[in-house]
From Swiss-Prot:
It is an enzyme of class 3 (hydrolase). InterPro entries: Isochorismatase-like_dom, Isochorismatase-like_hydrls, Isochorismatase-like_sf, RutB. The keyword RNA-binding does not apply. This is Ureidoacrylate amidohydrolase RutB. The gene is rutB. Belongs to the isochorismatase family. RutB subfamily. Keywords: Hydrolase. It comes from the Bacteria. The keyword Hydrolase applies. The active site is at D41, K150, C183. It catalyses: (Z)-3-ureidoacrylate + H2O + H(+) = (Z)-3-aminoacrylate + NH4(+) + CO2; (Z)-3-ureidoacrylate + H2O = (Z)-3-aminoacrylate + carbamate + H(+); (Z)-2-methylureidoacrylate + H2O + H(+) = (Z)-2-methylaminoacrylate + NH4(+) + CO2. Its EC number is 3.5.1.110.
Length: 248
């Protein structure tokens, strides 16, 4: 090959071998270079007292262990050279992106309903630029991480997530975050229909609602849409994987 010749294409230099991630219903073979760790909506709205879920009457008392597990998964992913993507749910300050009365989102979003019930909260919940919308301090993105805003439960709806993943040759999505039965499951389901392999790290997620909502979501994922694993299994599987370059 002439010294000035170039070959185009993402992943031409990727030499990492697949690892076998223990999961249900069966192990899943994955390469770090073809995998992204997805952190779903780890915002004050969903994980902090005084945030939207808390104000809407949902129990957020168990979110701190989830934050710790996600940090553990993030450390392993970054060490393996895996792409990290944060999803961030919310709307513009005027809530135009929320859809208005002509959208079912206006009628079903508990954040919007809470603000209508409590006018003193108007403009504070899931509004871009506000504390509620912000990611929790413990999970601040690092250089090389990607942040994808989203206006609905699914991270694929009206966002650049799909094109971001495809441009990097990513086929496997490892999910963490809140809420398992809402935004995590919605994004994983949509990914399934777009031919992505989705696996959720169960102990790095938390449901909105009672415990049976968590178990039902995990059952749906394991049985119909993807795989279920754990943070320890993820970390151990990729601990021996050689670090690969992440395209930015």
């Amino acid at each position: 090959m002439n010294a000035v010749e170039q070959i185009s294409g993402y992943g031409l230099s990727a030499t990492d071998e697949p690892v076998q991630l223990p999961a249900r219903p069966e192990p899943l073979a994955m390469k770090a270079s073809e995998t992204a760790l997805i952190v779903v909506d780890m915002q004050n709205a969903y994980a902090s007292r005084g945030g939207y879920l808390d104000l809407a009457g949902f129990d957020v008392s168990a979110t701190q262990p989830v934050i710790a597990k996600i940090r553990q998964a993030l450390n392993a992913a970054r060490a393996a050279g895996m792409q990290v993507i944060f999803l961030q749910n919310g709307w513009d300050n005027g809530y135009v992106e929320a859809g208005g009365p002509g959208s079912p989102n206006w009628h079903k979003s508990n954040a919007l309903k809470t603000m209508r019930k409590r006018p003193e909260l108007a403009g504070t919940l899931l509004a871009k630029g506000g504390w509620d919308y912000a990611l929790v301090d413990e999970l601040a993105p690092q250089p090389g991480d990607i942040l994808v805003p989203k206006p609905r439960y699914s991270g694929f709806f009206n966002s650049q997530l799909d094109s971001t993943l495809r441009a990097r040759g990513i086929r496997n999505l490892v999910f963490t975050g809140i809420a398992t039965n809402v935004c995590v499951e919605s994004t994983l389901r949509d990914g399934f229909h777009l031919e992505y392999f989705g696996v959720v790290l169960a102990d790095a997620t938390h449901q909105a609602g009672p415990e049976f909502a968590q178990q039902a979501a995990l059952y749906n994922i394991e049985t119909f849409f993807g795989w279920v694993s754990s943070v320890d299994a993820f970390c151990q599987s990729f601990a021996a994987a050689p670090e690969v370059a992440v395209a930015s």
